[in-house]
């Protein structure tokens, strides 16, 4: 097996497996269970223990909400606030809303790749917190506020609620000038898997539902997580810094998925989640996607289930089939996180005293890696179906 894992690392992993593996196993998320029922007999929203979730799903066809949970709760918006930054920038460009070429590059990067430098440029040009004040008045937002005192430059610390986020999307889709709607929604539909800071941003809505969808994601408070197929994540910036107590929670990990799902942008979906400080990004991703999958979203088609898992070792090959004799198609980032959509038996691999004939399928690579190098308590990954 061409995995280039040192003997020292294997011995260390074996020695601490008893205490490490039960901990990392929890990152796979809750095991499947019969759905609980909420008021009126409808399936309840799934919220893993320890997670704070604010949720809203709005059906544009009927003008009604199909899901609501803590919709007035103020959370730090992280990159979801880029919707307000974009709207404020476009507000005075009418009547044709032509964006200068240099600004268009920044504008597209801010929405497609969640580029922080672009957002900071527009934030500064627009007067910082004044952007939020203007947009609150223009859209009639009721639970949105500028960053707390002492953090004027931290646009990611803007307070936003699920209800107000639905209002923002409803304005873009139903009331904004057609050119404004096109400029924003075309970018959200073209959101890239890898953000500008190399976060993998296809969590929540993109993991839970098949296209068509359009997304604006947000993340803050996870430091520098393990690498993914997108590479090593850049250091935290202005949207993600340490903070003391404030009117909103600035210390918990924040992971949000917002956007539209279905033909004609039928459903507006907003899922804000907060996670205890120290929660790994892989655990938070699985929790957020579990919440999103449990929602009643009109016009949506469920995507195949998948989970994020941690790995160990270096030089771990991904192959075309579950066998070391098949051709390699890539290499897992050293100690990185990977998404697994199914697992199957294949050729047995023996390494460092471990034996395992189970292989995990990694959809982003289009191939299989041996489960030996997946952080899981046994030969198989809990919660992942067989291929």
Language model features with spans:
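SH3/SH3-like beta-barrel superfamily modules
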Residues: 330-378
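Short glycine/serine- and small hydrophobic-enriched flexible loop segments
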Residues: 87-95, 167-174, 339
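Penicillin-recognizing serine hydrolase domain
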Residues: 36-54, 58-62, 127-304
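Flexible glycine/proline-enriched surface loops and loop-helix/loop-strand junctions
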Residues: 67-72, 113-118, 147-153
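SH3-family beta-barrel domains
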Residues: 302-322, 329-334, 344, 379-387
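Conserved catalytic neighborhood of penicillin-recognizing serine enzymes
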Residues: 94-145, 161-162
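Active-site SXXK
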Residues: 74-98, 110, 269
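Secretory targeting and sorting signals
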Residues: 1-34
